[in-house]
From Swiss-Prot:
Motif NPA 2 location, chain numbering: 201-203
Family, per entry: Belongs to the MIP/aquaporin (TC 1.A.8) family.
The protein's name in its UniProt record: Aquaporin Lacbi1:233199
UniProt-recorded Gene Ontology molecular function terms: glycerol channel activity; water channel activity
PANTHER family, alphabetized: AQUAPORIN OR AQUAGLYCEROPORIN RELATED, AQUAPORIN-9
Source species: Laccaria bicolor (strain S238N-H82 / ATCC MYA-4686)
NCBIfam families listed in its UniProt record: MIP (TIGR00861)
Motif (NPA 1): 71-73
Regions crossing the membrane: 18-38, 45-65, 89-109, 144-164, 175-195, 228-248
Predominant cellular place of this UniProt entry's protein: membrane
Catalysed reactions, semicolon-separated: H2O(in) = H2O(out)
Its biological purpose: Probable water channel required to facilitate the transport of water across membranes.
């Protein structure tokens, strides 16, 4: 007989991923809204801090339960390089995307009146406020440059995540890992974040983008730059994380759980 405790145990890991991504988006998109929609001068650093705090809080709430992936690209990389069960990948990714949807919905509900004022009315919704939740590239960026920017930043992210979980390479304790991720995201945003708003995470972009579609932002969300939403913030991070994992395990990792074994 299945008990409530059994069902709770069955969904505990996906729910940790759900709340982790929801917190990531609440802090990150919330910071973007507060900076852009206020009368204060825009500050990319403030937005950068918001996303960095979000990744740290998301990792803290989920790390000891689900591993704190809070990113489909990292989940797939962990399945490829660290033996994470492939059968759990779909439930993790679904939970991560839904967390992005709910996180964006909560931020939108909190700032809806400010968005109305900024846009000039309740039924006016443009890319100017969509970009507070989903990622868009700067106008001068080519398609190849957009892809490479997301690929490169996610490769660095994946390499560092594998380093932070490598007990043979001075990995921090569980309590310090979120702080290390905070520092990592500050660095990634400061160095590689300007041109594409550094999604690095399919759930962080696709979840909020799905919510925006439900909120009335229209087809432009998905028609922008020939389906930018698919190849830049989804495909590029997934491939970038695979590349980062390949580099780390080929040249640095000495464990037995990698498919790349030198012994």
């Amino acid at each position: 007989m299945f008990t409530l405790a059994h069902h709770r145990h069955a969904i505990r890991k996906p729910m940790a991923e759900f709340f982790g991504v929801a917190l990531l988006v609440i802090f990150g998109a919330g910071a973007a809204c507060q900076v852009v929609l206020s009368t204060n001068p825009n500050s990319f650093l403030s937005i950068n801090f918001g996303w960095a705090i979000g990744i740290a809080m998301g990792a803290w709430i989920s790390g000891s339960i689900s591993g704190g992936h809070i990113n489909p690209a990292i989940t797939i990389a962990m399945a490829t390089y660290r033996g994470f069960p492939w059968r759990e990948v779909p439930s993790y990714i679904l939970a991560q995307v839904l967390g992005g949807v709910v996180g964006a919905a909560l931020v939108y509900a909190n700032y809806i009146h400010a968005i109305d004022v900024f846009e000039g009315g309740r039924h006016i919704r443009t890319q100017a406020t969509a970009s507070l939740f989903a990622t868009y590239a700067l106008p001068y960026m080519t398609q190849v440059s957009c892809f490479f920017s997301e690929f490169l930043a996610t490769a660095v992210l994946a390499m560092m995540v594998l380093a932070l979980t490598d007990n043979r390479n001075g990995a921090p304790t569980n309590g310090l890992s979120p702080f290390a991720l905070f520092v990592l995201f500050i660095g990634l945003g400061a160095s590689l974040g300007m041109e594409t708003a550094y999604a690095l995470n399919p759930a962080r972009d696709f979840g909020p983008r799905l919510f925006l579609a439900m909120a009335g932002y229209g087809k432009a969300l998905f028609n922008y730059r020939s389906q930018y939403w698919l190849w830049a913030p989804i495909i590029a991070p997934v491939l970038g994380a695979q590349a980062g994992g390949l580099l780390y395990d080929t040249f640095l990792y000495d464990g037995d759980d990698s498919p790349i074994k030198w012994r």
